[in-house]
């Protein structure tokens, strides 16, 4: 079936393919009408580009072949079909790519002349002299400092694409605020007269949509990129990477399912405000290329990028250098993910900074991520400052769950330098088979670890807050004793045990402590009254703090304090003892106990009266282990 479509240059026949609709054919163009031949292995790249130059393109559910990347057109949509490369594997870097959605690379952007401009952090206006910007222009801002990359050109500390929405003399108004205090320069994002890879004009792709397309290539399916307000939806197939490129800005990737042979994702060279959702990264063990292979690795001055609802599937035979790494990005959220990996010899989730003129890793969130390692794993979570000027701040790992072999190095690791420590990391991690918590030049963290067999060195307790909750420590729940009922003490046996709790061997950590409160009243003028709180020492003798009320005392009392474990062989008991009409006293005792990693620890509350004529009651009692709250 064919319909006639009128355009400025005349008319042509529009084919309605079986996978399309009449409405699609009325709105979209087919490469067939520009000489393209689907399904035969004929090179149709020129026909597809010609169709895109004329309007939106529908591939009609057919299979198309190309000999080089398709250079896309701003404002266009291409949808509904399969595209395979004809380029021979190894014929050249990105020669087998499917699309070129923009084509930034530091080597090609660096020579573009730039104008000095001034602004303030949070302002949407810049001041720039002798410019030619007009409303509607897309501009690129970048800092004057940065790092010199492997290609010997500048990778700026800060980069931003923005639309010009107002011009008044030297004042240029942008559609988004500046997000830095750096010294900036500016230029047109698509400058005239400058070429990039394959000698194609340097450009940024704006407001284009790629929808429901299967890609088939040994190369990256996106070549050098630079996008602004673009959308990639329903992309599937196989390629060297899943989401890969430079300068993805205000761009969305949704429902992407690609089998990759080298990298899961790299977003580099100033990617910002870009969101990835519903992504499946499937490593291809049959066609794996281990050269510089990584999982998800975001670097080079990015910010405000997100990844939601994703899977990273890494079978046996694929060993990535790192699974998910954030470096020189800020304001990143990676949430609701699942990682299935056979073996990992390095880090699974990491934040790393290598110093120099790189932007800091600030405000990084990993949340609700399940990791399943069927073989071996080295480190599950890692935070690393390699240099004295590395910058990492406000990093959080929330709701991370690990199942698999005990990590050979660490469940969680923090590493800094002597003069530049890692600080302020917050985390909650579960491990089904334990693992170590390792710290080197780090402090002031707040970490909660869940699961059996967790290893936390006693020495780190004073450096940060570490809560360890595990099934092997479940008997600590026996310590959570609260009574509001009045207990009358009638025993006249010294050392009468009113309450005992046993902490099993291997349960305690140096960061644990137990708060206690015992309160009540004494009476009777013919008998002493004793109340003590303590532990059994290494010789099984009771050692504690408390009071003995004389025969004439009739009073209300409160014994309130804390039991802590500063070393594996010592217990420190401190208490404040208040008795109405008597005053307040303080008690402190250090008790030598058997090593709690291999021996039980017994806590006791003892109470007795000197004779049956004495009156002693406990009206409130409470043991509250710190690590089982909240």
Swiss-Prot record:
It comes from the Viruses. One of its GO terms (cellular component) is virus tail. Homotrimer. The gene is 57. Keywords: Degradation of host capsule during virus entry, Degradation of host cell envelope components during virus entry, Host-virus interaction, Viral attachment to host adhesion receptor, Viral attachment to host cell, Viral tail protein, Virion, Virus entry into host cell. Functions as a receptor binding protein (RBP) and probably mediates the attachment to the host capsular exopolysaccharides. Displays a depolymerase activity that specifically degrades the K63-type polysaccharides of Klebsiella pneumoniae capsule. It is found in: Virion. Belongs to the K63-specific depolymerase family. Its main location: virion. One of its GO terms (biological process) is adhesion receptor-mediated virion attachment to host cell. This is Depolymerase, capsule K63-specific.
């Amino acid at each position: 079936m064919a319909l006639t479509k009128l355009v400025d240059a005349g008319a042509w026949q529009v084919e309605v393919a079986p996978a399309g609709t009449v409405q699609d054919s009325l709105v979209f163009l087919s490469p067939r009408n520009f000489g393209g031949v689907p399904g035969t292995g004929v090179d149709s790249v020129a026909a597809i580009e010609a169709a895109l130059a004329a309007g939106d393109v529908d591939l009609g559910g057919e299979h198309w072949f190309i000999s080089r990347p398709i250079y896309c057109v701003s404002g266009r949509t291409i949808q509904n079909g399969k595209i395979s490369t004809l380029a021979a594997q190894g014929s050249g870097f990105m020669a087998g790519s499917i699309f070129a959605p923009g084509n930034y690379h530091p080597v090609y952007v660096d020579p573009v002349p730039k104008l000095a401009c001034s602004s303030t952090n949070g302002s949407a206006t810049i001041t720039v002299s002798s410019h030619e910007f007009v409303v509607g222009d897309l501009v690129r801002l970048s800092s004057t400092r940065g790092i010199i990359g492997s290609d010997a050109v500048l990778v700026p500390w800060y980069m931003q694409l923005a639309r010009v929405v107002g011009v008044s003399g030297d004042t240029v108004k942008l559609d988004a605020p500046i997000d830095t205090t750096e010294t900036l320069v500016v230029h047109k994002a698509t400058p005239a007269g400058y070429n990039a890879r394959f000698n194609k004009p340097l450009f940024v792709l704006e407001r284009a949509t790629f929808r429901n397309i299967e890609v088939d290539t040994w190369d990256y399916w996106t070549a050098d990129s630079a996008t602004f307000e673009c959308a990639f939806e329903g992309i599937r197939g196989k390629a060297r990477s899943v989401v890969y490129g430079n300068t993805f800005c205000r761009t969305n990737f949704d429902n992407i399912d690609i089998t990759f042979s080298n990298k899961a994702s790299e977003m580099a060279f100033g990617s910002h405000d870009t969101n990835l959702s519903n992504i499946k990264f499937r490593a291809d063990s049959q066609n794996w290329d281990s050269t510089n292979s990584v999982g998800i690795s975001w670097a080079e001055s990015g910010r405000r990028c997100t990844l939601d609802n994703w899977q990273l599937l890494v079978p046996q035979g694929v060993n990535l250098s790192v699974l998910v790494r954030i470096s020189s990005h800020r304001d990143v959220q990676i949430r609701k993910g699942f990682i299935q990996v056979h073996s990992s010899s390095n880090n699974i989730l990491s934040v790393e900074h290598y110093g120099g003129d790189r932007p800091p890793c600030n405000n990084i969130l990993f949340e609700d991520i399940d990791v399943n390692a069927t073989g071996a794993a080295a480190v599950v979570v890692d935070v690393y400052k390699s240099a004295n000027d590395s910058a990492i701040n406000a990093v959080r790992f929330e709701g991370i769950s690990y199942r698999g072999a005990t990590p050979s190095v660490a469940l969680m690791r923090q590493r800094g330098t002597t003069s530049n420590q890692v600080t302020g990391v917050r985390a909650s991690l579960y491990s089904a088979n334990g693992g170590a918590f390792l710290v080197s030049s780090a402090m002031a963290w707040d970490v909660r670890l869940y699961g059996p067999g967790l290893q936390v060195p006693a020495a780190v307790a004073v450096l940060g807050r570490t809560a360890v909750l595990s099934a092997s420590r479940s008997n600590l729940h026996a310590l959570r004793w609260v009574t509001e009922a009045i207990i009358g003490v009638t025993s006249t046996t010294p050392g009468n045990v009113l309450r005992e709790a046993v902490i099993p061997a291997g349960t305690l950590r140096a960061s644990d402590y137990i708060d206690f409160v015992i309160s009540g009243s004494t009476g009777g003028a013919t008998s002493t009254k004793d109340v003590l709180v303590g532990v059994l020492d290494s010789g099984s003798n009771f050692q504690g703090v408390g009071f003995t009320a004389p025969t004439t005392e009739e009073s209300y009392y409160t014994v309130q304090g804390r039991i802590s474990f500063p070393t594996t062989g010592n217990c420190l008991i401190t208490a404040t003892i208040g008795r109405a009409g008597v005053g307040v006293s303080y008690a402190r005792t250090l008790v030598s106990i058997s090593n709690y990693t291999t021996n039980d620890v017994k806590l006791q509350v003892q109470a007795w009266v000197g004779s049956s004529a004495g009156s002693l009651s406990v009206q409130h009692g409470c043991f509250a282990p710190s690590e089982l709250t909240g």
